[in-house]
Amino acid sequence: MRSSRCARLLLLLLLPPLLLTPPAGDAAVITGACDRDPQCGGGMCCAVSLWVKSIRICTPMGKVGDSCHPMTRKNHFGNGRQERRKRKRRRKKKVPFLGRRMHHTCPCLPGLACSRTSFNRYTCLAQK
């Protein structure tokens, strides 16, 4: 009698958390921790957290009207002349970006551009 009561109580205590826990595949989306773009799902990139600069999280790419930053591709591999030349050659803004992003925003979605809308303010807008 007592063991069945304990079993029922244990079931009542453990069942709600089990029902509210997401499947194992979705757990990465909740934490969002990443190191590089390929670890994030489609339409997202791995960007620096706003709150803790040493952590990178999966962040959605910019949609029309979202604020953006023109240097979202900036990484911290060397600052020499060779690196600047390489950056000039690869102007395409692709995701996944294999470097480490140094800003908290992702590039705009394909077909959009990060355009200056006012002094020191950039927004994702349709490319002309």
Curated annotation (Swiss-Prot):
**Which intervals carry biased composition (Basic residues)?**
83-95
Q: Does the keyword Mitochondrion apply?
A: no
- Subcellular localization, as worded in the UniProt entry: Secreted
Q: Which GO terms describe its cellular component?
A: extracellular region
Cross-referenced SUPFAM superfamilies: Colipase-like
Q: According to the UniProt entry, where is the signal peptide?
A: 1-27
Q: Which Pfam families does the UniProt record give?
A: Prokineticin
Its keywords, alphabetically, are:
Biological rhythms, Disulfide bond, Neuropeptide, Secreted, Signal
Which superkingdom heads the taxonomic lineage of this protein's source? Eukaryota
Q: Which cysteines are joined by disulfide bonds?
A: C34-C46, C40-C58, C45-C106, C68-C114, C108-C124
Q: Which segments carry the region annotation Disordered?
A: 71-95
Q: Does the keyword Signal apply?
A: yes
Which one GO biological process term can you cite for this protein? positive regulation of smooth muscle contraction
What the entry lists under Gene3D superfamilies is as follows:
Lipase, subunit A
Role played: May function as an output molecule from the suprachiasmatic nucleus (SCN) that transmits behavioral circadian rhythm. May also function locally within the SCN to synchronize output. Potently contracts gastrointestinal (GI) smooth muscle.
The entry's family comment says: Belongs to the AVIT (prokineticin) family.
Q: What is this protein called?
A: Prokineticin-2
Which organism is the protein's source?
Answer: Bos taurus (Bovine)
